[in-house]
Structures are given as C-alpha cells and as structure tokens.
A protein has these predicted regions:
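Short glycine/proline/serine/threonine-rich loop/turn segments at secondary-structure transition edges
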Residues: 40-44, 83-89, 157, 189, ...
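A beta-strand/beta-hairpin structural motif
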Residues: 73-75, 180-183, 189-199
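Internal, hydrophobic beta-strand segments that form the core of beta-sheet-rich folds
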Residues: 95, 163-165, 208-211
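Beta-strand-rich binding/interaction modules
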Residues: 60, 141-183, 192-193
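Predominantly extracellular/luminal regions of secreted and cell-surface proteins
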Residues: 1-7
Length: 211
C-alpha cells in the first residue's frame, strides 16, 4: 500500500549514521499487476509518482521507462506504447536504491508518496501543464495570467481552442477567456497564454482566505 517506507520497520544500528536515522541502506523492489478497462482503448496512459527515494528505475511489461537519481520531485512516464490491450494483464516493477549519497536528514526509502495512472485523450493538457500568476492585484481589479501547455499525442496536427473560467465558491463565473484557435503539431506541445480580468476581487487574508 502506498505511500510506503520500508526503512521505518528495520532495526536501528549506529553504524549507518544519522543521515539515515541509523537505519540501513539497501535496494528494494515494488511490483504491480493490473488490467486496464475497455474505456482506456485509444487513449493516452501515463504513470505519475509523487515521490520515490531514491535512484529509481521503472519498468512496464519488461520495458525500462527510465532512471531518476533524485528523490524529491515527481516523476511522469508515458506507458501508452508498452501497454497490453484492455482486458490483458500488465506488469509494472520499480527498483529503488538508497545506497550512496544521502541528504543531511532522514528521507525514507521507497515510494514514499502517492502514485496513480493518468488517462487522457490524444489532445490534452499536459501533466502539471497549467501555470497561473496574478501580475496585477488590487481591491478594485485583478488580472489573472494563465499559461496552459496543450499536448498533441495524435499522428496529425490538431486545432485547439481553450476556454478558461474563474468561479467563486458558489460556482458563479467571475471572469472567462476564450483563446484564439491554435495549431498543435503532431507529437508536439504548445503553450496557450490567456488573461482574465476580475472586477473587485475578494482578496485573500488570514481572516478571509478566499481562493
């Protein structure tokens, strides 16, 4: 069951040092069998790991997806080319190696945060593909800048229009922006930039944490 840290149940020994909380270094494996439903046919499937500590290698159906030496950032791998047809058994394995360099604090060992499958259409907003800033903010008006990375995994170019909305806690639309029609080439990604103007926004304060 994830999240998981295999070190916390090991025996303490001073020979390992404080950086590992006096717990042993080592290599561990995670294995998972799963069957995709028919609804995933023709769609894009990725695996997202919020955190693996550390030096991880991920495999799907015998194919090595990649190696990540670091342990404090999320990891995304595209599974689509290597998956079996819906209804057939898939096998995933993750190798984790905690030997070698360590931080100055206890960082755990294994898949210490959540992991999940991300299923999308061929044309979709990329994972972590929404970037929002507020370049202008006052009690009278605010401007929200949104950059959205649209990914096209299909074999031909696609025409895309994005509609962004800002809603309050009740669902009322406070601002909206429809982008121009853009072309996203086959196998590429494109950043769509939009601005939304808010009139008399409810500003965030500790007493009124409006988001």
């Amino acid at each position: 069951q994830l999240p998981h840290d295999w070190n916390v149940k090991q025996d303490f020994d001073s020979k390992w040092g404080g950086a590992t909380a006096y717990l042993p270094e080592g290599i561990g494996w995670y294995q998972k069998e799963f069957i995709l439903p028919a609804s995933t046919s023709g769609r894009q499937v990725s695996i997202v790991f919020d955190g693996i500590f550390m030096q991880s290698d991920v495999y799907i159906n015998g194919h090595h997806l990649g190696h990540r030496p670091y342990g404090f950032c999320s990891i995304v791998y595209d599974l689509t080319p290597y998956l079996k047809a819906p209804g057939e058994l898939n096998f995933m394995a993750v190798r984790v190696n905690t030997t070698g360099g360590r931080p100055r604090w206890y960082a755990g060992a294994g898949i210490y945060r959540h992991a999940w499958l991300d299923v999308t259409e061929d044309v979709h907003v990329d994972t972590y593909g929404t970037y929002i800033t507020t370049p202008q903010v006052s009690a009278e008006a605010a401007q929200v800048a949104v950059v959205t990375t649209v990914k096209n995994s299909s074999p031909k170019k696609q025409y895309v229009t994005l509609l962004q909305k800002v809603k309050d806690a009740t669902g009322k639309v406070l601002a909206k922006s429809r982008s121009q029609r853009v072309v996203v080439e086959a196998g590429k990604a494109f950043d769509v930039k939009q601005l939304l103007d808010l009139v008399q926004p409810k500003l965030w304060t500790p007493e009124s944490p409006t988001l």
